[in-house]
């Protein structure tokens, strides 16, 4: 029949399963991938998250994605007025019910959750065949340098008995059962050096990823910085999986491990292309100014007795403390520093239009922001920016915030602990130990920000706003912009929970680029994967013209130089096999 002939020429639409989804950063990026005709080849059909606040954010965004970018008017009214959230189940019952099916509040590894997931995974495989993608990153607390340092301080802590070290096996179990065409696994850079039983955990992770299901070839998104003589040899090093977000046009120096796996029968031979070459390289790095300039100027709050007048007096007092403290500087530097500090105090106390703590008007991007990033972030339908209220600070910290911000503005670097005058040192026993030299760190206008992490939920000392006149730490929305979440992405929960969600997420703008590259790579398949006859197909997307793959060869082929001893294959959850 003509219809069948036409359908046979159409490329496959891939069903995406998002594990450890958080607020949905990876899913947001993959959902935005489209061809020249506006067709979206990736459809997120299942997201799994265990934290209630993050799941609430994920559920709302899953609901909104069903409106194909044209969100309901009620949503914008909700964001603008700050009124109670509409009852979506009443207004849009079909879309809300579907969202509740797609976004699941579950903890992987729990019997009840695994039983439910088995049924859903089998349904997805039945409908889409092998044309599925798995994305996500197991929680990183056990692998991060900060988390490991914290664990070492716990009496009786035994890494081998910490289940957080083995959460990645839940991911492996899903791969084994679903056998997706490809997967994306994300984690912190500290995973490369984390060890269990005197063995590097990352070696075990890579081994398990390669052998999951029907077997996978692992590929790297990073440019080659050393020669690779034979593409048939698995010569990738662990560091080849580290992605520097600033190299992909993000306004943040975020370095994360991202492993891309392609099922071996999908690309059964190495091909003449590197996956990183499918992502356009950025000639200019995005900066803090690109995304924070153009946002409303806000004042910080005070943790006690906050008011506009009290805040102005607190900044005035902080300025006096800083001016006295910098008397140790050389004469010329001291005068310039004091002049700028006094300007900030004047803004706080004599401004005819006092700063508020929340944004009450739309926001723009910096004039130097790239058009692609600007288009990604901004939404002309927004009346105000959501999640953009400042937090309260101790009055005693304002002098340190003011010093750090003025220092960064004038010296173009963030001050270390040793750069602070002694009179500004906080009452921390470890202040002079050297372990926390960046305890008070200001972000710099003309540089990518430092890594936005969940620690921003604890205090704002490490994320001081670069404008000293605002004398504060970043808001949730400012952190979200540095993480490249669109302005219309609403984070639910209290402010601490919102910060945690933003800090733990994969930047959506980076996820979108990874999705673009992965889809282009999947178009190089010589034939449709076996078992995909029942897969859903999508409108035609032209195959890209691509010049050479930074890939590993099939498991079992290795050079003498690249050979590594592999650990024992661990027992996996049998319910997900």
Segments from the language model and where they lie:
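Core alpha/beta nucleotide-donor-binding catalytic domains of modification enzymes
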Residues: 3-15, 21, 25-178, 189-203, ...
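Generic recognition of flexible, low-complexity loop/linker segments
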Residues: 4-6, 245-247, 436-441
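C-terminal target-recognition/interaction regions appended to catalytic cores
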Residues: 14, 308-577
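Short, flexible loop/turn elements at secondary-structure junctions
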Residues: 20-23, 52, 138-140, 189, ...
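Short acidic (Asp/Glu) and glycine-rich catalytic loops that position anionic groups and cofactors
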Residues: 38, 272, 458-462
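Short, flexible loop/turn segments with low-complexity composition
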Residues: 70-79, 219-225, 525-544
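Class I S-adenosyl-L-methionine
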Residues: 124-125, 145-422
């Amino acid at each position: 029949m003509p219809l069948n002939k036409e359908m046979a020429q159409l490329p496959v639409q891939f069903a995406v399963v998002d594990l450890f989804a958080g607020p949905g950063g990876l899913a947001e990026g993959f959902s935005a991938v489209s061809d020249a005709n506006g067709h979206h080849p990736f459809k997120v059909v299942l997201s799994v998250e265990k934290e209630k606040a993050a799941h609430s954010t994920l559920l709302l965004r899953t609901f909104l994605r069903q409106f194909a970018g044209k969100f309901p008017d009620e949503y914008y009214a909700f964001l603008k007025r700050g009124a109670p959230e509409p009852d979506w189940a009443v207004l849009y019952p079909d879309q809300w019910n579907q969202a509740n099916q797609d976004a699941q509040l579950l903890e992987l590894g729990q019997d009840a959750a695994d039983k439910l997931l088995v049924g859903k995974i089998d349904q997805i495989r039945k409908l889409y065949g092998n044309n599925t993608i798995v994305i996500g990153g197991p929680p990183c607390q056990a692998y991060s340098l900060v988390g490991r340092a914290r664990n070492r301080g716990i009496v009786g802590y035994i890494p081998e008995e910490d289940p957080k070290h083995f959460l990645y096996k839940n991911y492996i179990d899903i791969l084994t059962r679903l056998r997706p065409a490809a997967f994306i696994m994300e984690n912190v850079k500290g995973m490369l050096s984390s060890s269990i039983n005197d063995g590097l955990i990352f070696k075990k992770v890579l081994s398990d990823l390669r052998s999951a299901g029907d077997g996978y070839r692992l590929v790297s998104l990073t440019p080659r910085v050393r020669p690779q003589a034979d593409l048939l040899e698995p010569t990738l090093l662990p560091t080849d999986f580290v992605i520097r977000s600033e190299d992909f046009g993000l306004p943040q120096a975020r370095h994360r491990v991202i492993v891309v796996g392609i099922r071996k029968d999908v690309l059964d031979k190495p091909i003449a292309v590197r996956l990183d070459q499918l992502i356009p390289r950025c000639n200019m790095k995005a900066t803090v100014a690109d995304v924070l300039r153009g946002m409303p100027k806000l004042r910080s709050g005070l943790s006690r007795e906050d008011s506009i007048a009290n805040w102005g007096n607190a900044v005035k007092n902080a300025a006096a403390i800083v001016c006295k403290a910098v008397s140790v500087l050389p004469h010329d530097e001291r005068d310039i520093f004091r002049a700028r500090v006094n300007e900030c105090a004047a803004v706080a106390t004599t401004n005819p239009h006092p700063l508020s703590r929340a944004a009450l008007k739309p926001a723009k991007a910096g004039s130097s922001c790239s058009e692609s990033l600007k288009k990604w972030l901004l939404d002309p339908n927004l009346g105000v920016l959501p999640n953009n209220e400042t937090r309260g600070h101790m009055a005693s910290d304002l002098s340190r915030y003011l010093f750090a911000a003025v220092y960064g503005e004038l010296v173009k670097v963030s001050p270390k602990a040793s750069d602070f005058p002694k009179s500004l040192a906080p009452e921390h026993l470890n202040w002079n130990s050297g372990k926390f030299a960046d305890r008070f760190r200001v972000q710099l206008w003309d540089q990518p920000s430092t890594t936005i992490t969940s620690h921003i939920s604890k205090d704002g000392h490490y994320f001081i706003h670069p404008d000293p006149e605002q004398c504060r730490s970043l808001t949730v929305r400012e952190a979200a912009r540095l993480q490249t979440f669109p302005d219309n992405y609403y984070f639910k929960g209290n402010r601490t929970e919102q910060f945690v969600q933003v800090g733990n997420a994969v930047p959506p703008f980076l996820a979108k680029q990874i999705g673009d590259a992965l889809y282009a790579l999947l178009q190089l398949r010589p034939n449709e994967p076996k078992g995909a006859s029942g897969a859903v197909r999508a409108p035609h997307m032209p195959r890209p013209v691509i010049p050479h793959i930074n890939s590993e060869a099939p498991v079992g082929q290795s050079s003498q130089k690249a050979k590594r001893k592999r650990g024992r294959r661990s027992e996996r959850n049998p319910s997900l096999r």
